[in-house]
């Protein structure tokens, strides 16, 4: 598990042994898995457990703002 970003109380990680499609796991009070290239090349929530709806929305905005950098990190980690 590689922490690629810490921001606004969230820890965003990429698992080095994970699978495509490119996605991140967001940890806060719960966990969310977010696809980096969903419909229209926008982040897409795959699932969330134990997160408030407000935190899910906030994490989606954070991923959208940092999407390009996160895709670069995904490719660095997974080749």
Listing of model-derived features with the role each one plays in the protein:
Residues 51-79:
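C-terminal structural segments of small proteins and small subunits
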